[in-house]
């Protein structure tokens, strides 16, 4: 399966979908979820209810299990019910799901490939960095 839908000029690819989860390719420039209740910026969270059959419950929060930064594109897993959300959250908590990040760099590198094995943490002063 390789379908997609459009939301506010963003094309969101559906890489996989079953009764419990959907795996999407979130484009760069799209927030994962609202910053606050008054935020009307385009975000993945708002696009889900009109494109997926998601069990409606405050605990499910429109299926968002993890997030990607606004400027980061990549795979994001959506839970479609509370059971799958709890299982996925537990898997992330236990680090049973491995995340890999690929960065594109401009300029000349001395090597074709490098590996950076460091924790990625939020900038406490500027939350958008």
Regions found by a protein language model. Give the residues of each.
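RNA pseudouridine synthases
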Residues: 1-129
């Amino acid at each position: 399966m390789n379908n997609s839908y459009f939301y506010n000029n963003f094309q969101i690819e559906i890489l996989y979908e079953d009764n419990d989860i959907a795996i999407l390719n979130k484009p760069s420039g799209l927030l994962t979820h609202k910053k606050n209740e008054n935020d009307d910026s385009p975000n993945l969270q708002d696009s889900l209810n009109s494109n997926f059959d998601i069990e409606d419950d405050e605990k499910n929060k429109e299926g968002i299990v993890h997030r990607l930064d606004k400027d980061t594109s990549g795979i994001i897993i959506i839970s479609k019910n509370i059971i799958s959300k709890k299982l996925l959250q537990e898997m992330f908590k236990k680090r049973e799901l491995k995340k890999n990040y690929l960065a594109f760099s401009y300029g000349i590198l001395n090597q074709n490939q490098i590996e950076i094995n460091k924790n990625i943490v939020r900038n406490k002063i500027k939350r958008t960095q």
